[in-house]
């Protein structure tokens, strides 16, 4: 399969995946296209797991946990080297337990001053990784990652009171950085699931106004599930 043809298919699938806002719609797309896309040198499937996100230079902030969901291609160059692009429409970042800041409303400021703030940022991300076999079915991976911010809100909580503040004007539309990690295939056979751990460190200052450089940092634990690869193996003619 040529890289140009693969790029077109990846772009079409990414657009469909993003437009399907609910998780079950994304799973359905993967099931519909998986069998047609998988081959001896190409795996396609779903990836999902846990994000543990933080933002640098926000005093006393704690990490924020959230679930990610996307699709992946695993393109075999040789037995040890792979190109591994992903499209992840559900990629949460942000922080929790931030000290309240002024909303320029004395009444609200007084009510919310004893609580804390959770910053929730929704993104679409596309990492383009190189995977190299270290030993057996254990792979190292590294590469660039670009993110598109879709929503950004701060949630103030003080006792039973909750207040939502839209901060999209404060957060950059795009984020760029690098990801590195390890991936362990659970079996040698085609179509095997893989369990991975990854760290993303952003190089973009995502806050347009606050002093200091605020950059995304995310730990990920993911499970990758090829779709249709097992059927392709069954259909392959015997040598």
Predicted feature locations:
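Flexible, solvent-exposed loop segments that connect beta-strands
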Residues: 57-60, 92-122, 150-174, 206-212, ...
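Short glycine/proline- and aromatic-enriched beta-strand/turn motifs that initiate or cap beta-hairpins
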Residues: 24-76
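Outer-membrane beta-barrel biogenesis signature
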Residues: 4, 21-43, 79, 86, ...
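Outer-membrane beta-barrel "beta-signal"
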Residues: 184-188, 215-239
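Residues that define the transmembrane beta-barrel architecture of outer-membrane proteins
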Residues: 40-42, 63-67, 120-124, 172-178, ...
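Residues on the lipid-exposed face of transmembrane beta-strands in outer-membrane beta-barrel proteins
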Residues: 46-50, 67-77, 87-89, 126-134, ...
């Amino acid at each position: 399969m040529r890289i140009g043809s693969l790029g077109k298919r990846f772009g079409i699938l990414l657009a469909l995946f993003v437009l399907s806002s609910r998780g079950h719609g994304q799973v359905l797309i993967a099931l519909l296209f998986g069998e047609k896309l998988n081959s001896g040198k190409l795996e396609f499937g779903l990836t999902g797991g846990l994000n543990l996100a933080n933002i640098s230079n926000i005093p006393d902030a704690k990490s924020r946990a959230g679930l990610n969901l996307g699709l992946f291609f695993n393109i075999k160059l040789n037995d040890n080297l792979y190109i591994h692009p992903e499209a992840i429409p559900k990629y949460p970042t942000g922080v929790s337990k931030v000290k309240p800041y002024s909303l320029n409303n004395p009444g609200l400021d007084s009510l919310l001053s004893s609580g804390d703030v959770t910053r929730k940022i929704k993104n679409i991300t596309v990492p383009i990784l190189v995977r190299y076999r270290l030993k057996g079915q254990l792979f190292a991976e590294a590469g660039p990652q670009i993110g598109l911010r879709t929503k950004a809100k701060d949630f103030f909580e003080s006792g039973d009171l909750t207040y939502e503040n839209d901060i999209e004007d404060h957060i950059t539309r795009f984020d760029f950085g690098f990801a590195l990690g390890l991936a362990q295939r659970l079996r040698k056979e085609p179509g095997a699931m893989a369990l991975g751990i990854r760290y993303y460190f952003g190089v973009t200052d995502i806050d347009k106004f606050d002093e200091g450089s605020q950059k995304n940092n995310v730990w990920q634990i993911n499970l990758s599930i090829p779709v249709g690869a097992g059927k392709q193996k069954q259909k392959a003619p015997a040598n």
